[in-house]
């Protein structure tokens, strides 16, 4: 079962990128590998209910149960110990990844207050894109009235692109709203 964005990739993005970068084989064209969502919840060290709410929010947003991340070292100034739960993360692949990106591009990002586009400089040099979201309430799955606290999250989009230019062209072909 192909999602709308996956079908768009095969029908429109692959031919456009083959022409733009001069690829001879469709398998050379960069593609999306995974989308990783990470939510750090520092307050979870003192109140376990906060982490449960964060896990529930991320499960609604991603459509799958996130993994609780634990601290690796004790930090006295943050009042956390080694092994304490301090966040959650999930990795989306295949159909869920395409569905999440479709919702992110077409529904969630336009709902951000004063949104002018995402920065085009957030690539890591190896063709992967990272961005942060300040509020989880931009996603339509989250009920605004049921939210206990506004939490942000990190979104990492991993591609097979070798360079940042290829990755940016790939995401721009998906109608990703870049500012520059």
UniProtKB/Swiss-Prot annotation:
It holds the Pfam family Ribosomal_L5. Keywords: Ribonucleoprotein, Ribosomal protein, RNA-binding, rRNA-binding, tRNA-binding. GO terms for cellular component: ribonucleoprotein complex; ribosome. GO terms for biological process: translation. The keyword Cytoplasm does not apply. PROSITE patterns: RIBOSOMAL_L5 (PS00358). GO terms for molecular function: rRNA binding; structural constituent of ribosome; tRNA binding. The keyword Cell division does not apply. It comes from the Bacteria. Part of the 50S ribosomal subunit; part of the 5S rRNA/L5/L18/L25 subcomplex. Contacts the 5S rRNA and the P site tRNA. Forms a bridge to the 30S subunit in the 70S ribosome. HAMAP family: Ribosomal_uL5_B. Belongs to the universal ribosomal protein uL5 family. This is one of the proteins that bind and probably mediate the attachment of the 5S RNA into the large ribosomal subunit, where it forms part of the central protuberance. In the 70S ribosome it contacts protein S13 of the 30S subunit (bridge B1b), connecting the 2 subunits; this bridge is implicated in subunit movement. Contacts the P site tRNA; the 5S rRNA and some of its associated proteins might help stabilize positioning of ribosome-bound tRNAs. This is Large ribosomal subunit protein uL5.
